[in-house]
Amino acid sequence: MKKFIFLHIIFLLSSFSFFSQVEFNAKLSKNSLGLNERVKIEFSVDKDGDNFTPPSFENFRIVGGPSQSIRNSWVNGKRSYSKTYSYFLSPIKKGSFVIGQASIEVNGKIYKTSPININITASIDKPVDI
């Protein structure tokens, strides 16, 4: 009987990883840049999703992207998956701005990233991209 209960507990604990929460986030290559620089923004999700919708990128010009990369691996029977959407942006004007939420659908449910703050300063002498 103890073995039976123990096996059920192990089965339940291992099944929680199958139903784990979806992680969908946004990441900037830098949070502050000059008006003549570019920034890379990546939106990554750890489950296979569809219908990705980027933010409007208000106050920015898209100079590259979107590009998409997928990483899928199995190590010791455990699956690791990541899908990333990347854009290169060039600011249009100086100021502090918020890059809005992106969204993606995973298993019929919509997930959104958190908005990101970014600061655009005057043009700099030697721009350092990305």
Predicted regions: what they are:
Residues 4-17:
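Sec-dependent N-terminal signal peptides
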